[in-house]
Amino acid sequence: MAATRMPANERKLLMLEAAVRVFARVGYAAATTDSIAREAGVSQAYVVRFFRSKETLFEEAATYVVEQLCRRFAEAPIAADSTDAERRKLLGDMYAEIVKDHDMFMMIVRLFMMGSDPRFGQLSRDSFARVYRVLREDVGMDAQQARLFLSHGLLMNLVLSLRLWEGERDLADEILGFLGKGRAEAMYSLHDAPGS
């Protein structure tokens, strides 16, 4: 009996998810198509044949992650009569779930730090603008609500990517005080886990 061949879209997704893990761990410069191929369990030639270059693979992996983030926000089960506080809490809880996926979190952080990169700057800016527009147009936040939500998210990203709690625990707790008691601690624990 012949082995069933995986459809092309599933193979592409397998490689994109592997690329997200590798780029999240080591960044664009240190990642190689070979390391991504090993992570995906395919040959380097297969990755190159599918994506042509590491640059294209990074662009597609970044777009994949941003689209996942935007989809989660756009599909949030927010009632039409929910208060601003209820909406922020629901979206904040959703973002906290996203942050638990360390690879997705680090890919977003790395992408949003590349605004001045000559290759990826436009992708970085477009991706951030896409998230903002989803919050405004799909979620229904006004400009002030979207700014507050994004500022809290970016503070979380910064504190977590700096691992600020390792040397400045009181400061990290103060900065993330808007999360509420115990939630910052839970975030630290997730990022203290092996492989994070």
Give a label for each model feature.
Residues 85-109, 114-122:
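Helical hydrophobic small-molecule/effector-binding pocket
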Residues 6, 10, 25:
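S-adenosyl-L-methionine
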Residues 118-129, 135-196:
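Hydrophobic/aromatic-rich alpha-helical bundle segments in the mid-to-C-terminal region
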Residues 45:
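Key DNA-contact positions within bacterial/archaeal DNA-binding proteins
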Residues 14-21, 25, 39, 49, ...:
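Alpha-helical structural segments
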Residues 1-5, 89:
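Short, Lys/Arg-enriched N-terminal segment that forms or immediately precedes the first helix
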Residues 28-38:
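Ser/Thr-centered, proline-biased regulatory motifs
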Residues 10-11, 42:
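The short coil/loop that forms the "turn" connecting the two helices of the helix-turn-helix
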